Amino acid sequence: MEFQKMHENPDVLHVGTCQNRSYFLPKAPEDGEESTRVCLLNGTWSFRYFDSFLDVFPEGSEGEICFDEEDMDEIEVPSCWQNAGYDRHQYTNVRYPFPYDPPYVPDENPCGLYLRRFCMNAEDLTQKIYLNFEGVDSCFYLWINEQFAGYSQVSHSTSEFDITDLLNEGENSVAVLVVKWCDGSYLEDQDKLRMSGIFRDVYLIRRPLAHIRDYFVKTTVSDDLSHADIRVEMDFIGLPDVTAELYDAEGALLESTAGAEPNFALENPHLWNAEDPYQYTIVFRTADEVIEQKVGISKIEIRDSVLYFNNVKIKLRGVNRHDSDPVTGYTISSEQAKRDLFLMKQHNINAVRTSHYPNAPWFLQLCSEYGFYVIAEADIEGHGAAAQTGGYGMDEYADNALNPIFDKAIMDRIQRSVIRDKNNACVLMWSYGNETGWGPSFEKAGAWVREYDPSRLTHYENTYYDARGHKNDLSSLTTESRMYSAPEWIDEYMVDPKYTKPLVLCEYIHAMGNGPGDAEQYQQLIMKYDRFMGGFVWEWCDHAVYGGTTPDNRDIFRYGGDFGEYPHDGNFCMDGLVYPDRTPHTGLLEYKNIIRPVRAALVNRETGEIQLTNYRDFTNTEEFLTLSWEIQQDGDTVACGVMDDIKIAPHESGVITLPDAIPTEGDVAVLLQYSAKKNDSVFFEKGHPLGFDQLIVSRGARKEEALRKGFVIAVEDSRAVTVTGDSFRYVFSKTEGVFTSMVKNNVNIMTRPMTWNVWRAPTDNDQFVRKEWEQAGYNEPAIKVYACNAKEEDGVVVIDCKLSLAAVYRRAFLHLDCRFTVDAEGKVRAEINGKRDMERPFLPRFGLRMFLPKSFDTAEYYGYGPYESYCDKHHASSLGHFAQTADDLFEDYVKPQENGSHFGCARVTITDGAGAVTVTSPEDFSFNLSHYTQEEMTKKMHNYELTESPDNVFCFDCKMSGVGSNSCGPRLAKAMQFDDETFTFKFDLTVE
């Protein structure tokens, strides 16, 4: 039979596929845990790769596929063929990887032909045989025994074929031609590494001739939650006799009924929620088949623009999750998915958005079992249309949504998502897709969703713009969804009468690299407004391809541009809360503590009363909370204890009283550490940390030690001031305005001259302001000293210096008026007064940089630790005494950038155990100790390319700007910018 091309015809989406149904795997009546009705075809298949679709049909083939296995390679199914060495990886976010010409795709379109054999016996052939593909990117043609059996697209949805009539007794063959791009690819422009192939399970299902084709378990709950009805709508092939049995979670039979429309009634039902994911089980039985279906009962409502779940105002503490693994790509096993979900639970996350496509069908079963609210998203994203003219136009953005050729596909994709996953308790919202604009196709599909399943909420973000004159009809949407909205806009939303729906941020606090730095600001708003349902961090994991290790055993993770591809979007795929290997970023630790289940506030210092608020939605603290408390004075613990009998209802507050007095002098804090009260055999054990509060009661005045007066002299020449005492000799540059040598006890503590420091290796969130910084010359300042005078005065040496920082061809951006006082023991007391050019952007930082011997590898400090901390990202850290090495302090981002700074410090000592450099200040400052210079981290694109400095780099800063989330979110908040017109930096520098 001559081949008929279908993959550029939007009117032909599926050929030979069965009608959509919910996901279930039937069993034989005698089966145990595993089903003998299901035969996995995963494993080794024969494979032939073609660089072009045109190569599939060589000259003389007369348009027929060659199924000869001779000279075919082998490939594992499921997998992505790029991970097997074929084609190449590509990462692009918005831009399509081919010209925008819907519905057409290039003829030079890579393909893969898969072939394997399987056997059928005579008994098998008396039944219905279905062939299922759970995920194939982007489309595929199917042959059974070299007879054409069908065609299907929608990469992340199940395609099921009835192949009964094409089978023979004995050996049979299945052949699949997978095409990299099709007309559907215009709706699959998701922000991810682009891969191809049969990437999810393939299996056969044997079913009796008469069987249950589909069912929809519908639950209703009375207003007072005292009664629930379960009604099952069923569809059949043939007319099997059906019985249905309802079991509780412990396996006790509650009720049995017969008939085609089973109904159950429950008094005082145990309702499902993410904190208590209780599920009943319905067992459907026919003469030859058993189907088990988990059922979670809940009541989802919007009242007065507020989300209620089982009559409770819940909050979504969510993440966006892609199927992504650095080794297996899109192919994700249940064990890999469980690892993600367990990590989420361990970090207080309660919601997942399946961005931007349906995950494997069993993934939602796991979410229902473990307790996650899910935004179940259809396989739709078409934002590449916005780039069709080379720019980024809002009218063009919606072209796919407005183009009638995609009406059928958009309806199909949304229906496939809803129908497949409708029986999962975890589904809170049906999402129509992502970033495709809005148009009649979505309006029609949305109306279908609301009619088919009115029990869930509906979601779509890209609705705020009426493109090309179309007046958006948003009546099918129950929520207002936005992404990366600034906190100020959220405040405006809540008081603007035109907004009447509850708000969710489907993407926020972009977690790329060192960040997010503004999570607490958003969380305060989530807690403030009932109408603000919560948000979903973009995103869960960094996307990368594992490239092995370097000769010195450093992991190689590759991202956009590392594969020679065009177009690409660099490391924009490296934007997760966890590294590709699932090691948590500090951003995940930050988010975990910001969404901690309990928060504290000091009520009365004298009586030791502290108010605790329980932010769990359904669980009393007596069920989950052990509280360990410490009273800290100047970083030392002066009293401590444990409380595990605290009873506070959900959303309520209670007061505890510490049995010990809170000091009244010095730096005083109360540290409250929340941990799991009991074992949870799945997620974590008793004592697992849930978060903490550190209540800063007071910051004591820092006493300035008197300078030691005695023998100290200064000798000047045209270039330097040399300051000498009994045990030291320092050289101060009159051209740079800093010390170039500091010899103490005959040892020069500096391997290179000190430098003024305003630059930081740009974080991913600095990528836009970086251009402004470089234009201002912050990355390459030259120093001009206008005046430098030294004098011996009352047993000390005073150096006064006026200077500026300016880059070549640009005017000065910073003027400094400095005084350095050196006492008889070599202590340097500095007072630096700065004045900025306010026409320039805010500074990354301001401070000084020292280069120390490699042996000076330990930082002992009093500040925020142990994790990297910034003015807007320090909620995973607490104020205290810490000792860490340069390796400990380094956060190894795949793309090197500013990392490892510590905020809120009063003191830091860099030591090798014998010598030491100490900085103290009357005001909080930041420091960093690293093996790498900021110049090295600025120019290198991958962490495995970094070359260590021959010295250790010690930076101490008057102030460091925050990190924010501007890689995709709002510009760094003004309050977190180092944007002061004038400032003063005072510190003491001691060398021992």
Region spans (language model):
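Extended substrate-binding grooves/exosites of carbohydrate-active enzymes
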Residues: 2-33, 77, 84, 92, ...
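An acidic-aromatic substrate-binding cleft motif
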Residues: 279, 291-351, 358, 704-766
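Accessory beta-strand-rich segments of carbohydrate-active enzymes
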Residues: 2-18, 31-32, 46-52, 72, ...
